[in-house]
Amino acid sequence: QRAGRRLKEAAERLRRSVFVEGQVPEGRRRSAQLHAEADEVYLRGRGQPVVLKLGVAYEGKQAVGSNRQALRERRVVAGVMPGTAFWEQASAYWGTHWDLSAVQACYLGGDGAHWVKQGLQYFPRACYRLDPFHLRRALREALSPSEETYAQVCRAIEAGDWAGVESALRQALRGRRGPARERLLRLRGYLREHWDGIVASGEAPRLGAIEAEVFHVLARRMKRHGARWSERGADHLARLLSERVDPHWRAVLGGRPLQISPGVRQATRQAVQRVMRQLEED
């Protein structure tokens, strides 16, 4: 709990220094492009669900094998907080690494939630991209990949042709009744609402990293069967887990980068595991 609290306090000090005191983060790394993605994960709470937010920023993807890619210069933020506080902490933290004024194009990805789109306010020249995982899920909830309408809609989406999307869905609606028709109507509304984030752009790279980040950083450790979380406990552990995959947090916490020996890294992993067990038992 203590280590997680220290990380939260450090993030809040950094946020206040930027958004209350008006200081400019001193990030020195320059990148023409920046990719940022964000999502939520719901945990079982004590009475009501606990909602964790996670965001990741990176410069792009690089091959690390025949079938794998890694995020270049990955920086992670997580915790239990409202959308505004999340983006203020995230932008302040990422600003300690990158010179955000040098970013020529920022691509923000997510599931279309309002709080995710709030991130557009914090990054220069940012545009929104709907996460491909959520787009595929919305399509498959209403259409079978084996039917012609699915293929027609996908082709129209790739072409940025909203009229083509509407035409295909309108044709399909003629033969639908009951729940199947309702699902198709929901799909049409979803695509219309998020069309600006769906339309393919030759300049926009493929995003789609956030689902894996949520799983590997948070969900596989915190969504254990039977575990119930307090907001404070979940927030503190989420920050610890973020620090494990993003050691740059140590620079924010201690004021300078730290050289961590393998022995200390192992001790840190064991301490995190003990904290997880204690929080689940509380």
Whereabouts are the PLM-identified features?
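Catalytic center-proximal scaffold of phosphoryl-transfer enzymes
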Residues: 1-282
